[in-house]
Amino acid sequence: MAELPTAPNGVPSGDYLHRSIDQLRSLGHLTTAQLVHDYKPFNISEFRQNVAERLDYSLKNGLVQHQQQMVMEQQPHPDQQQQQHLHHPQQQQHPPQLKVSYSAPNSPPTPHEQQEQKYDPNRSPPRQQMSSASGSGSNGSSPEEESRRGDGDQAKPYKCGSCSKSFANSSYLSQHTRIHLGIKPYRCEICQRKFTQLSHLQQHIRTHTGDKPYKCRHAGCPKAFSQLSNLQSHSRCHQTDKPFKCNSCYKCFSDEMTLLEHIPKHKDSKHLKTHICNLCGKSYTQETYLQKHLQKHAEKAEKQQHRHTAQVAAHQQHVPASGIGLNLQRQAMNDVNAAYWAKMGADSAAASLAEAIQQQLPQAGGQPYGNFASLQQQHQQQQQELLHHQRLADTPGHSHSPHEEAAGEDLVLRQSTPQHHLQQQQQQQQQQQAQQQQQAQHQPSPGPGNSAFTPLSATVAPPPHLQQHRGPPGSAAAYLYQQNAAAAAAAFPTQLISLHQIRNYAHQPGAAGLIAGDHLALGLSAVNAAKEKAQ
């Protein structure tokens, strides 16, 4: 059985333990700000001394013996069970005192203590081993169950329920659970930033104060760091075969050339674009960027060469360079746009419209309605028939029967068919010759007021015995104009015509030229009669 030692001052161990526990509890009531500000002066130093004394106490009382027993348990020995049974009651005799002695709060050691003590908590923490030893006795777990555990479970028996990480100490597990729960009890009073661990807060405060407690112990190296990890990375430069180190960062190099290439990165000219491309003029800060850019130029040149070869091959095969797919697409677009009219002038548009109308119009008697030559012939025939009817009415001594007047009206309103066209022309010519002879015999010589171009109202009135057949002069003139208007309306086509057809129709004799044609015919007949009489 191991006896509890006395304190260094000769005070019994029980009083010493109770007094240390009271001091630790009083420290636990302090705020975070007091812990931070009182870190260097007084309270924390006493706490360090207490922790050091407890570590020495744990090392002196059964720690080495417990480690030896663990090694013996791993080795096959016939008396293994007897030793375990003998060791088990010894641990059960003093579990309360050991638990009380390790009830101190968790706080990491300072950098100086880490360098002096060289204490690795992940390797063999004394608190974990003593608590595991006491826990095995208190929980009543048999040594057989402990022997069944693997080496990994013995090294890190505390597993996190949220992730797959395991820890060697329960305090480390409690610190790790703060990450999952989002608990950050330590806060910086300068920038109000919060942390899950006190060590993280201490490292953060050094960024505000500029303290660098981790100094390099290599001869002739004056560097110091605020974090231990930076010191460890720096110490590798002295341990390896890289004597050439950069004064601006922690990197080391094996030769001087690589160091000289690395140094310009820390100068003021590191942002200057000194590497220029000879092809396009672009500039870059590093040569690697320029090389990547030149690779793009090479890829573009290869693509252009492939395109040129494809164009040459297509030209030799008489295939457009655009490809068959584009030609098919263009043909499809032309087919879609075929429903729309192409851009053309007014005359060409009117001519195309006239052709379309003539093709669509129904043909009656083998001749289309849009044939203006046939319409013009019909106009001339109607004019001749009207003149013949008027001259018969104007000739003195010629008696008009109702049948003749009806026949004359029928001639005016009737449209000649193409079959009797030649016969009617011959008859009209004969009638005109006969009328001219009769007019030359019965018509007096033209006076100064009677001219071939005088209007109809200025002509000589007929004899009284013909007034009953003719009616007043105004009625005869009105009847003539009505007949001309009816003929013009019948001659004009009812379908839509084009602008080109309208232009041609304006230059042809139509409804507006009927009256002028009558006067012209009368004048010619009078001149011919005068010539015959003179002969």
Swiss-Prot record:
Keyword check for Oxidoreductase: no
Modified residues (Phosphothreonine): 395
Keywords: Developmental protein, Differentiation, Metal-binding, Neurogenesis, Nucleus, Phosphoprotein, Repeat, Transcription, Transcription regulation, Zinc, Zinc-finger
Gene Ontology molecular function terms on file: DNA-binding transcription factor activity, RNA polymerase II-specific; RNA polymerase II cis-regulatory region sequence-specific DNA binding; zinc ion binding
Assembly behavior: Interacts with nab; which acts as a coactivator. Interacts with ap.
Entry-linked PANTHER family: C2H2-TYPE DOMAIN-CONTAINING PROTEIN, PR DOMAIN ZINC FINGER PROTEIN
Protein name stated in the entry: Zinc finger protein squeeze
Upper classification of the organism: Eukaryota, Metazoa, Ecdysozoa, Arthropoda, Hexapoda
